[in-house]
A protein has these predicted regions:
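Extracytoplasmic metal-acquisition and chelation regions
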Residues: 1-211
Length: 211
């Protein structure tokens, strides 16, 4: 899949014919995952990435420096606000643990001093074993967890089955590994999904999602 640089209105910054493909084809199989790769799911890392992206874009397209700086400041300010606002909110809660299908939220958990309990590994390709599900049920009941998080944009079948077992409910968390048709329709970007993730986690813990 080729990628092209666009401005905030969706217009190409350079003529398409002059653009170079950043990556052709799928990126799957290029790396062997031995660590949590979901580092973008962090308000702290996100700010670093926006700064790094701005610097590289200015280096390549200095004529657009003002636009890049403006957009970077907007994004960094939003993440800073989310960080400060929700760190205060999470500090006031006794609950810290949440149950999730996909093991993708270690960085977000770190940012807000939370603990994730995943059913799957670092990829969402494999299904959890019956033994894993039984342990998750016992874990949830022991800690009075009533929310099971599924990956936003994918069927919540496994999360719903577990939620029914513990008499709970399901809620979405976005790993942002892919873009869904619904996200395109709603024009949901990185900041929107980060805010949704943090808000959903907070609401579940505030109302009884762990201890």
């Amino acid at each position: 899949m080729p990628y092209y640089l666009q401005d905030s209105d969706g217009e190409l910054l350079k003529d398409k014919g002059k653009q170079k493909d950043l990556l052709e084809g799928s990126s799957s199989g290029l790396d062997k995952i031995t660590y949590d790769p979901h580092s973008w799911l962090s308000v702290v890392n996100g700010k670093k990435y926006f700064n790094a992206i701005q610097d590289k874009l200015i280096e390549k397209y200095p004529e657009n420096a003002r636009l890049y700086k403006k957009n970077k400041l907007k994004c960094v300010d939003k993440l800073t606000d989310l960080d400060a606002q929700y760190n205060e909110k999470f500090k006031a809660l006794d609950r810290r643990e949440f149950l999730v299908v996909h093991y993708a939220y270690a960085y977000m958990a770190r940012d807000f001093n939370l603990i994730q309990y995943p059913l799957q590994g670092l990829t969402s390709l494999e299904s959890p074993s019956l033994k894993t599900i039984r342990k998750a049920v016992d874990f949830a009941r022991d800690r009075k967890i009533d929310t099971v998080f599924y990956e936003y944009g994918k069927p919540p079948k496994e999360a719903q089955a577990l939620a029914e077992e513990i008499g709970g409910k399901v809620a979405p968390l976005a790993s942002m590994e892919f873009v869904t048709a619904d996200q395109k329709k709603k024009k949901q970007g990185y900041l929107d999904l980060m805010e949704m993730n943090i808000q959903n986690l907070y609401e579940s813990l505030e109302k009884g999602g762990g201890q």
